[in-house]
Amino acid sequence: MAMEMTLQSKWLGATWGTLGDSITAAGGYQPLVQSALGFSEVFNYAVSGCPMTAGGDRDYGATTHVGQSIAADLDCVTILAGVNDFRLDKPLGELGKADVYTFYGAYTTLIEHILKKNPRCRLSLWTPLQRDKDGYDIFYVNAAGHRLVDYADAVAAIGRQYALPVLNLYELSGLNRLTLPHFTSDGLHPNEAGHRRIADLAIPFLAGL
């Protein structure tokens, strides 16, 4: 009970907004984290099947666009993106260039918008999980010349640039080619056990911010 109260003390009654793709849109890990940390409300802005990066036929749901219209008074905002950018061959671009048609540019444009609009919010970046679906695994090189780890590394680099905490699910989740059948329904989308694993990492991560 004492540990539960300690975990809840920081976020008890706070609001949390989640941005991302289908993994976040599923709403699987959020209730677990909310219960443990005491968030009063969770707003799920994720759009299934869409990347961070603008352009293409999924531009409508690009996280860089969707994030422009989130509530301006959220206490906590988390972004879990990158796996669809890998799958859809989005170029990384360069850190420091505000081109929303590249992963770096789209991500940093979103971050700057959120922090200018709501500088008091605690914003954190979560790397993509590993995957093994439809031939797209951690070894596959996409048409832009990148592996999935390159997008995960880009998230970490962006976090360093903006002094934002990064939850490295790519490295720490334990989801890999051997365990994906247990934690996902198809090598990509977490099942109940997968969402529990994400929550188990997210709870102490957010509690420590």
Model-identified regions with their sequence ranges:
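Conserved beta-strand segments of alpha/beta enzyme cores
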Residues: E41-F43, R122, A163-P165
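Structural signal for conserved beta-strand scaffold positions within catalytic alpha/beta enzyme cores
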Residues: N44-A46, L125, N168
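Residue-level recognition of the N-termini of beta-strands and the immediately preceding loop/turn
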Residues: C76, C121-L123
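Hydrophobic positions in alpha-helices of CheY-like receiver
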Residues: L110-I114
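Catalytic His-Asp segment of secreted/periplasmic serine-dependent ester chemistry enzymes
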Residues: P128-L209
